[in-house]
Amino acid sequence: MSARDGNTASEWVPTGSVTVRVPGKVNLYLDVGDRRDDGYHELTTVFHAVSLLDEVTVRTADILSLEMTGEGAESLPTDERNLAWRAAELMADHVGRSPDVAISIEKTIPVAGGMAGGSADAAAVLVAMNSLWELGVPRRDLHALAAQLGSDVPFALHGGTALGTGRGEELATVLTRNTFHWVLAFSPGGLSTAKVFAEIDRLRAEEDRTLPPRLESPEPVLAALASGDPAQLAPLLGNDLQPAALSLDSTLRRTLRAGVDAGALAGVVSGSGPTCAFLCGSAGAAVDVGTELAGAGVCRTVRVASGPVQGARVVPSPSNAG
């Protein structure tokens, strides 16, 4: 049924807009199993939401539309190929309405950077529409909708730090004491998640290829997070996809080396890359590392961030003006 079919639609859908902020993620630990028959890989990962936030505003409208500005926005589709668009359609379908909203996204999370920016925006649309339309869809149902959109979308709702299993969509909250401080190095280009997974499959199939040992258990990482000690966490950061990302973009080796040379405790490729995340001992150390890394000429740009932060949340409106 279309939202226009009933004469109560205008009463049911308030006018105005809702803005949601949503974080990017870093994978502190990413154990990638062999390719399954369905084409997916079994994952065990520790997600960590960091203070690099996209801002998504959803307004009532006559027709579904999407506009994007900011970090890498010009390279992104603004139609049904975009996960945020599909999130609007899915949410509307879930409640039996037409997806008549205008979505505006201000990007800060890098595009195709291994920080799940597209997934974050999709999660934000679900939260924004739930609020804008006053639906009261419970969190567990939002999580189920998020999992239909993609394996990183549920964590963008969840935020904080979480252990992800399955394809990454099954989440358990992880106790994290303390705030951890990060420097994020953005690469000039992006890496396709599908290509990185295909590359790790290819590398593993080469008999004469020596890869780093696969990750075995997230338990030491969870213990380090509970301790709140960045020095304990640093040597445990790991990513089974890192050899594939380095194979596809060899410049990342220089970036990783430069970050540690600048004073980071450790560096890791985030998810499928190419963003590199550097753990630092303090907020001040992160600023120093970021400054030095920015001048080293090994990445496009540098951001300082901290985590964990909460997942997709409505921004309180400073006024009632729509």
Curated annotation (Swiss-Prot):
Job of this protein: Catalyzes the phosphorylation of the position 2 hydroxy group of 4-diphosphocytidyl-2C-methyl-D-erythritol.
Any one biological process term the GO annotation gives: terpenoid biosynthetic process
Keyword match Chloroplast: no
Sites where the protein binds ATP: 110-120
Root EC class: transferase
Signal peptide segment: none
Protein name: 4-diphosphocytidyl-2-C-methyl-D-erythritol kinase
InterPro entries: GHMP_kinase_C_dom, GHMP_kinase_C_sf, GHMP_kinase_N_dom, IspE, Ribosomal_Su5_D2-typ_SF, Ribsml_uS5_D2-typ_fold_subgr
Catalytic machinery residues: 25, 152
Top-level taxon of the source organism: Bacteria
E.C. designation(s): 2.7.1.148
Family per similarity comment: Belongs to the GHMP kinase family. IspE subfamily.
HAMAP family: IspE
GO molecular function, one term: ATP binding
Keyword tags: ATP-binding, Isoprene biosynthesis, Kinase, Nucleotide-binding, Transferase
Pathway terms, separated by semicolons: Isoprenoid biosynthesis; isopentenyl diphosphate biosynthesis via DXP pathway; isopentenyl diphosphate from 1-deoxy-D-xylulose 5-phosphate: step 3/6
Catalytic activity: 4-CDP-2-C-methyl-D-erythritol + ATP = 4-CDP-2-C-methyl-D-erythritol 2-phosphate + ADP + H(+)
